[in-house]
Curated annotation (Swiss-Prot):
Main enzyme class: hydrolase
Region IgE-binding epitope, residue ranges: 91-105
Protein purpose: Has exodeoxyribonuclease activity with lambda-DNA and salmon testes dsDNA. No activity with circular plasmid DNA. The physiological role of this enzyme may be to degrade environmental DNA, and thus mobilize nitrogen for uptake.
Quaternary state and interactors: Homodimer.
Influence of temperature on activity: Optimum temperature is 45 degrees Celsius. Activity is about 80% of the maximum activity at 35 and 50 degrees Celsius.
Protein name, per record: Antigenic protein SchS21
Keywords, in A-Z order: Allergen, Exonuclease, Glycoprotein, Hydrolase, Nuclease, Secreted
Molecular-function GO term, any one: identical protein binding
Effect of R100A: Significant decrease in IgE-binding of the 91-V--P-102 and 94-M--G-105 peptides
Location in the cell: Secreted
EC number assigned by the record: 3.1.11.-
Length: 144
């Protein structure tokens, strides 16, 4: 299982990972626009991540959330604004690497394709175990 992080602007960011109880710890990393960065996860990892500019204060923002190896071996994922809906500059979109469908999140926030309230029905599901996540302002040029 993996997530590839694609920085769309010129900002270096720190990525902080929080695993659910029983999930392995994933090291905090720094990513930037020079190249995409792929993080490997254990096959049944459940948790989330957020990003913040490396030269800024560590403030949790928009979350990328995932459950690898969930019910029937599926991957469940979403972009969540519940913790900090004012973060419009860090975690933006998530999608399965091969099919690129379904996509969660927004190229420009706010939109109706992310979790805003705890009872929103926004969790996406895929048979794939490799995902992409965009960071920062800009467009992938992909059509979802």
């Amino acid at each position: 299982a993996s997530v590839t992080f694609w920085t769309l602007d010129n900002v270096d960011r720190t990525l902080v990972f929080t695993g659910n109880p029983g999930s392995a710890a994933i090291e905090t990393i720094t990513v930037g626009p020079a190249e995409n960065t792929t993080v490997e996860f254990p096959g049944s990892w459940v948790g989330n991540w957020y990003a913040y500019p490396t030269d800024a204060e560590d403030v949790p923002g928009m979350l990328g959330e995932v459950q690898f190896g969930g019910w029937n071996g599926l991957t469940y994922f979403d972009v969540s604004a519940i913790v900090n809906p004012t973060d419009h500059d860090n975690v933006k979109q998530m999608w399965p690497a091969e099919s690129r469908k379904p996509m969660s999140g927004c190229e420009v926030f706010p939109c109706d394709n992310a979790y805003w309230l705890p009872d929103d029905i926004q969790t996406k599901v895929t048979h794939e175990v490799d995902l992409w996540t965009t960071l920062g302002a800009g467009s992938t040029g992909l059509t979802f």
